[in-house]
Amino acid sequence: QKESQVMVGPLVRQCAGEFFVDKLFVGTDGFLPEIGFTGGDMMRTEAMKSMAQSAKKVIVVTDSSKFSRQGVVVQFKLSEVHSVYTDNGIPNESKKLLEEQGIRVCVPEEGN
């Protein structure tokens, strides 16, 4: 993504270990029910995974269209995600699956 301001590569892995956060908010490129969230770029996904190791909770923020797309690399397994924030277009089966895995699904109410 040309316009994103993201640092990737070996320096991220080294730097990420120096930080600790309660919550890591991440975007995603896709979703596979049997695996979890997927990314479209290996280097960015590696950067997110490195940062997640220093976080208490991983929170995925994404629009519902990503639940019908698939990235090329595993970003986060379901067991690694604490909560998901998305819009009310999330497929019912995806929402149910996430909740069954103990993942909190947050969807804004209409009109808010």
Regions found by a protein language model. Give the residues of each.
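Conserved phosphate- and dinucleotide-binding cores of soluble alpha/beta proteins
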Residues: 1-112
